Amino acid sequence: MPGTDEALPATMAWRSLRAMCRRSLARQAELSVEGSHHVPASGPVVIAARHYHHLLDGCAIGTTIDRHLHILVAADWASGGLARGVLDRATRVARWPVVLRPDATRHRPERFAAPGAIAAYEADAAMAMRRAARETVALLRGGHALLVFPEGYPTIDPTFTPKTRDDETLPFQPGVIRLVALAQADGETRVPVVPAGLAYERIGEDRWRIALRFGEPVAISGRDRSADIAALTARVRDLSGLGADAGEGGGAISLSGR
């Protein structure tokens, strides 16, 4: 369990963030919630959610669940300077695991044109992943709640998204299954994975009607990661009001309108 010197700043940071999120939601969203009872009130849990909006997804879930959430975040969107420094400090205080998305070099090659830039980034990404895995396992074994977005990229993002349609969900990354398996490898920890669906409807220039739906925990065997990730993907898409297969679903919002 984290010591008081470590836990208190993280708790204070979370309370401040929740207050900011409530203000953002009041300005930008009408939120409805179903199934929040599926999230255990205590003990380790991973909430695996659809990623639609870069900001409001986390705010909707974080203000709904009456628990201190830790969020697995990607930091590669902040390439350096002040933004990266602020992000690094904030995630350390909040005890949020941080990764660098390995496919960033493919999606945004213009950022890696300098000689050796790709190799350096790949080394940094591997190091960040190992550190995030250690931190995640420690959090889960310590009884904490973790929010992850297995797609890796939101649909609405001011920096970059590889998505081209409103109803598109990217293939879920299997890392979430691996992290759960690592946490459970001690033979004592059991980590339920709660799927969370998000459905957005635009009701103004920058205002949304958001339906957040939690489902029953998905059984993660850890023995067949492909089957585990397929089951989780299908459940999150279903809760989001999309088809069972990626690429199906009713897209009511054009990405060109973002």
Q: Where are the model-predicted features located?
A:
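Helix-to-loop junction immediately C-terminal to a conserved catalytic motif
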Residues: M20-Y52
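Catalytic core of membrane glycerolipid acyltransferases/transacylases, capturing the structured
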Residues: G43-Y121
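Non-catalytic C-terminal accessory region of glycerolipid acyltransferases
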Residues: A114-R258
